[in-house]
Amino acid sequence: PTSLGIIFFFFFDWAISPTHPEREERLLYTQDQFREEGLFDIEGISEHRPLRAENVDILRSHFCFPTVEAVCTESHRISAGGAIRAAQLVLEKQSQRAFALVRPPGHHAMKVVHGNRGFCNINIEAVMVEWIRSHYGIRRIAIVDTDCHHGDGTQDVFWHDPDVLFISLHQDGRTLYPGSGFLNENGGPKPA
């Protein structure tokens, strides 16, 4: 039988405004629906708590100005820790698949961080990739981003990395933030 580990975010110290589209109610509603529909009663589906990303985890993939503490709240650390926990579940064979439902989001945060871009302060996908590399020695990784917005930050972080395949499936950049993600954006020059 297949198994699926689901990680929910449980801290809510980060908010833009009560009416902003990126708000905690989105995830709370999803959590409620999962429970109401009995998702966790299905054999093979289990719920897990996220880990917490430490400074060393964040700094493997980011340059934070002026400091990590200046750009990250506890929520950012737990959100990145949710992605790390999903990877850990699969790589340690505790689950065949894992899905992290976490916020705040991350795929617009670039390698150099000095504030937020598209509601993203740190790139949780990049933090997870570098954590996998550090803890398991896996170099070649594929990321498939299925958000309606182009994952421009993830693209930026791994642009010059020949060992990361990043695919962003998104709405046309001419009609939606961040206005990028076109066919000619297909990787930087190979490192010397």
List each model region and its residues.
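Metal-dependent C-N hydrolase catalytic cores
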Residues: 1-133, 139
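Conserved alpha-helical scaffold segments that buttress catalytic/binding sites
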Residues: 84, 88, 99-192
